[in-house]
């Protein structure tokens, strides 16, 4: 594994280089390279079929690439692991639809997700340590749900459920967060609050955010990567990629 990292001069939380994968002759990912630094937030945009979901599937071990390198922190080859193992290594993934347990409180949802529990349901009957309590309170404050910690998750707004699931995800202490269309279905106010949350998260985690909402991406104020036909079409600030003629033709102008 050390041989794989000899030519990587910089430190990366996530390193994809020359990655390709085909399904029944269709090249879903085509020589894709993506380099995410520790503490970096990156927005990923592109039309339907651009390869955004497949890219995340490859990173998380759901799909094996045909060629290329996929490394975590420069030296861990993620292609050797399945989804559960990749999650334990330190790569967390949040899908578009929230998957909180609505019959439990906000506090209990985060309690269940805390890393190191022997089993999901046993943790409900296992006394929390002072350290556990402190960690849960820190997460509740981070996701701005400390005042709703006793409320049932079912009674939260869509945006609050998204924040709760993000809290559950970070309770497992991932170093890289992959987040799929977080702003979908949110109110304008929730969207802006989510952007602020992500900025706070980026101080301790690397974030890869797949999104269609350009106002949300603008609020993130981060580097943007545009995917098209499974490859990187353009990278830069949102203003830079919006002015790119190729991007206008294949995506933003549609």
Put a short name on every predicted segment.
Residues 79-80, 139-155, 160:
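Conserved ABC nucleotide-binding domain
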Residues 123-148, 196:
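Conserved ABC ATPase "signature" region
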Residues 45-47:
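The feature captures the beta-strand-to-loop junction immediately N-terminal to the Walker
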Residues 177-181:
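Catalytic Walker B motif of ABC-type/P-loop ATPase nucleotide-binding domains
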Residues 69-88:
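ABC ATPase NBD Q-loop/coupling interface
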Residues 60:
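Helix-to-loop junction immediately C-terminal to a conserved catalytic motif
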């Amino acid at each position: 594994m050390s041989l794989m990292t000899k030519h990587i001069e910089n430190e990366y939380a996530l390193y994809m280089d020359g990655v390709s994968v085909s399904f029944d002759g269709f090249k879903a990912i085509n020589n894709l390279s993506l380099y995410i630094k520790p503490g970096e937030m990156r927005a990923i945009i592109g039309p339907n079929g651009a390869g955004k979901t497949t890219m995340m599937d490859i990173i998380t071990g759901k799909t094996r690439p045909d060629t290329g390198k996929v490394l975590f922190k420069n030296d861990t080859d993620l292609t050797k692991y399945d989804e559960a193992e990749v999650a334990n290594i330190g790569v967390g993934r949040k899908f578009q639809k929230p998957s909180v347990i609505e019959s439990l409180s906000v506090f209990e949802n985060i309690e269940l997700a805390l890393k190191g529990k022997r089993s999901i349901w046993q943790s409900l009957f296992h006394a929390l340590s002072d350290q556990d309590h402190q960690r849960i309170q820190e997460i509740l404050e981070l996701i701005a749900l400390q005042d709703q910690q006793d409320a049932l998750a079912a009674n939260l707004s869509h945006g609050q459920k998204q924040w709760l699931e993000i809290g559950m995800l970070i309770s497992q202490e991932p170093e890289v967060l992959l987040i799929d269309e977080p702003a979908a279905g949110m109110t304008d106010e929730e969207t802006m609050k989510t952007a602020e949350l992500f900025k706070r998260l980026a101080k301790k985690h690397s974030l890869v955010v797949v999104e269609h909402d350009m106002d949300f991406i603008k609020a993130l104020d981060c580097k943007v990567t545009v995917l098209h036909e499974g490859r990187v079409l353009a990278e830069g600030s949102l203003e830079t990629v919006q002015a790119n003629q190729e991007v206008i033709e294949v995506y933003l102008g549609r």
